[in-house]
Amino acid sequence: MDKLIIGRYIVGDSFIHRLDPRSKLLAMLIYIIVIFWANNPVTYAVITLFTLFLVFLSKIKLGFFLGGIKPMIWIILFSTLFQVFFNTRGNVLWSIGFFKITEVGLNQGWMIFLRFILIISFSTLLTLTTTPLSLSDAVESLLKPLTIFKVPAHEIGLMLSLSLRFVPTLMDDTTRIMNAQKARGVDFDEGNIIQKVRSIIPILIPLFASSFKRADALAIAMEARGYRGSEGRTKYRRLLWNCRDTLSIIAILALGLILFYLKS
C-alpha cells in the first residue's frame, strides 16, 4: 500500500516538470483520444515509443511507472481476459465449453491491455511531475470559461487537489493499521476468499474513522483561515503558458495525425 504512486509528486527539473499543468492536462485528454484511434500493431508501436520518450524526458525511473500499473494489474487482466474469452465475433481459434477464443477477441484483448498500460503510464507521468496544487489550479483555469453556466470551477479544482493530497495519506494509514493488526496476530494471507474479505473489516473501520477525523480537522483549519470559496481570492502562484507548452500540444497533435494516417 505504501508503494502506491498516484497522488505522489517527485521533485525534478526536467522538461516535463517545467511544462504548464494546463498543457499537461490538455495533452492527456488528446493522448487518450489518440489511443482509441490506434487499431493495429504499428499504431500501438508508435504510441508506445512516444510514451517511452516522454518517460525519458521526465528523468524519472521506469520503476515508478511500473508501480503505478501494479495496483491496477488485476483489473487490466480481467478486462483483457473478458475480451479474449467472451468476444464471439470472428473466426474461432480455440473453444472449450462456453469459452471461445476468436480472432477478433484476441485482437481486442491485446489492444485493451495496451490501452490500460499506456493510459495509466501517462496518468502516472502527470501526477509524478505535477504538484496537486498545480493540478488544482490548472483544472480551475481550464473550467473557468464554464462559470458562466454556473459550473463551480474553483470547487472542482479544490476537490481534485484534496483528493490527490489525501490518497498517499490514506495509503499510509492503511499500512499502519495493517501492521498493527499483524502485530496482534492477524494473517491477511491465510484462509479462503470469504475469510480474506472478513479480515479487511478490522482495517476499514479504523480507516474510515481516521478519514473522518482528518476531514473534520481540515474543515476546521480552512474555516479558521477564513476560507470562503473562490469569491475575492487571489493567487500567489500564477500559471504561465510559454513556447514549450505550445510545442508540446503541437507534438501530441502531430502524433494523432500520424496514427490517423497509419490507421487508414
From Swiss-Prot:
Q: Name one GO biological process term.
A: riboflavin transport
Q: GO cellular component annotations, sorted alphabetically?
A: plasma membrane
What InterPro entries does its record include? ABC/ECF_trnsptr_transmembrane, EcfT
Listed GO MF terms: riboflavin transmembrane transporter activity
Q: Which UniProt keywords apply?
A: Cell membrane, Membrane, Transmembrane, Transmembrane helix, Transport
The UniProt entry, under HAMAP family, shows: EcfT (MF_01461)
Protein name as annotated:
Energy-coupling factor transporter transmembrane protein EcfT
For this protein's source organism, the top of the classification is: Bacteria, Bacillati, Bacillota, Bacilli, Lactobacillales
